[in-house]
C-alpha cells in the first residue's frame, strides 16, 4: 500500500488537485492524506463545482492547515512522499527556506529531511528570478518540479484532456501505474 500526502495551496489550478484525488481514490492500493490551505478551499469554490465535503471524501485522512501536531508533520509518519498541487509561490518559498509555518510547508520540510519523494506543481506565470531560484533550490534538494505544461502530441480536445496529462505525470513520479492519458510512442 502506498501512502501519499497531498497538499493543496491557494494558487489557481485546483482542478489539478481534484483530478489527482479522484484518480488516487479509485486505487485501493493508495492511502491519501490531505491538507488544504484556506485559499485552496476558496479556490475550490471559485474554480470547480466540488464542495469541500466532496473533495475531502476522496482522501483517507484530512488535516487542518494549522495543525502542526498532525501525523504528517512528523518524520516517524511513514509515507511514500508528498505532492503539492497546485503550489503557490509563497509555499514554494517557505519550503525552500525551511519555514514550516503551516502544515503544508512543515510536511514538505519533513519529506525533504526524510529524503522522500516531494513533487511540486507550481502554478504561476510569468516566473520571476525569485520564483526560479526557489524552485531550483528545491530541485537541488531532490524535489521533482512538474509544472502544469500541456502536451499536444495527444491532440487534447478539452480542458480535462490537458488535466489528465498532468495527472499522469504526477502519478508517474510516484511510480503509480496509470493510463490517465495517451503516452508518446514515437512517430
Swiss-Prot record:
EC number: 2.5.1.129
Outcome of gene disruption: Cells lacking this gene are unable to decarboxylate gallic acid and protocatechuic acid.
GO molecular function term, any single one: flavin prenyltransferase activity
Keyword set includes Metal-binding: no
Signal sequence region: none
Binding site for dimethylallyl phosphate: 153, 169
Cited Pfam families: Flavoprotein
InterPro entries membership: Flavin_trans-like, Flavoprotein, UbiX-like
Binding site for FMN: 10-12, 37, 88-91, 123
Coiled-coil residue windows: none
Cysteine pairings via disulfide bonds: none
EC class name: transferase
Function: Involved in tannin degradation. Flavin prenyltransferase that catalyzes the synthesis of the prenylated FMN cofactor (prenyl-FMN) for gallate decarboxylase LpdC. The prenyltransferase is metal-independent and links a dimethylallyl moiety from dimethylallyl monophosphate (DMAP) to the flavin N5 and C6 atoms of FMN.
More about this protein: Gallate decarboxylase does not form a complex composed of Lpdc, LpdB and LpdD. The term subunit has been used in reference to the three-gene operon. Gallate decarboxylase LpdC is the only protein required to yield the gallate decarboxylase activity.
UniProt protein name: Flavin prenyltransferase LpdB
Protein's organism: Lactiplantibacillus plantarum (strain ATCC BAA-793 / NCIMB 8826 / WCFS1)
Lineage, top ranks: Bacteria, Bacillati, Bacillota, Bacilli, Lactobacillales
Designated gene of the protein: lpdB
